[in-house]
């Protein structure tokens, strides 16, 4: 387990505290629709941090060609119908390019700045000329007004219990997922980013914001920035 990361509950737990069975139960929600609307029809998509395929499978059903990348073999075992690659995202170099590179699950908020830089470099390295990078970022109130909870229509409760500063601009976040038959918890490190800080991080990797895709600013379409 990585320092500052922990997970509890039934089944396998990944190094960043994610429970494989939990993620196999979580619905995809509106996220595949957001990605599909921002992507060319039938696009080749590189999904970084695919997990069990929560978004992979709906995107495949919409006619996209998805390559799913995750560092967890246990997660990738659940992916069906897509090419899978087991690798830490920040170390990935496939030697090919994609119409769309997707970095979801708030991964851009990694508590480790060097990891974040590696994630964004991987995005920039794999996006085709004329392509785009779709990034999911935290909402403005993600670390405030806690605890808060949401009851999903499918019958489980997700609760953000706390977000405590641990130094250097990083917070330790604790989340709980309560189902009728099981409970999972996850503790992880996250670095809140203002819009300005987020856009600066993209610029450092040679990317720039094309537009924000959702009213709350949590989904972003970025594109390679031409040099010179």
Question: What is each residue range found by the language model?
Answer:
Residues 104-105:
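Residues lining the SAM
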Residues 1-51:
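Conserved class I S-adenosyl-L-methionine
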Residues 117-129:
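A short glycine-rich, Lys/Arg-flanked "PGG" loop and its adjoining helix->strand segment in the class I
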Residues 93-101:
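A short acidic, Gly/Pro-enriched loop at the edge of an enzyme's catalytic core
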Residues 201-228:
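C-terminal lobe and adjacent flexible extensions of AdoMet/dcAdoMet transferase-like proteins
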Residues 134-197:
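SAM-dependent methyltransferase
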Residues 52-91:
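Class I SAM-dependent methyltransferase SAM/SAH-binding core
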């Amino acid at each position: 387990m990585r320092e500052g990361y922990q997970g509890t509950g039934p089944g396998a737990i990944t190094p960043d505290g994610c429970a494989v069975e939990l993620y196999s139960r979580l619905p995809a929600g509106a996220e595949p629709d957001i990605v599909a609307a921002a992507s060319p029809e039938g696009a080749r998509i590189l999904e970084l941090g695919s997990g069990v395929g929560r978004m992979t499978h709906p995107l495949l059903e919409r006619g996209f060609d998805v390559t799913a990348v995750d560092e967890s073999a246990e997660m990738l075992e659940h992916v069906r119908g897509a090419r899978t690659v087991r690798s830490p995202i920040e170390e990935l170099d496939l030697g090919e390019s994609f119409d769309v590179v997707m970095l979801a699950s708030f991964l851009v908020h990694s508590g480790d700045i060097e990891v974040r830089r590696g994630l964004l470099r991987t995005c920039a390295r794999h996006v085709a000329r004329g392509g785009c990078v779709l990034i999911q970022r935290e909402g403005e109130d993600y670390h405030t007004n806690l605890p808060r909870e949401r009851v999903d229509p499918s019958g489980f409760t997700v609760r953000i219990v706390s977000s405590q500063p641990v130094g250097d601009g990083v917070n330790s976040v604790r989340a709980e997922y309560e189902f009728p038959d099981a409970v999972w918890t996850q503790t992880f490190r996250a670095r809140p980013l203002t819009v300005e800080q987020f856009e600066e991080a993209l610029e450092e990797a040679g990317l720039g914001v094309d537009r924000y895709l959702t009213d709350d600013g949590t989904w972003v379409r970025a594109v390679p920035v031409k040099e010179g």
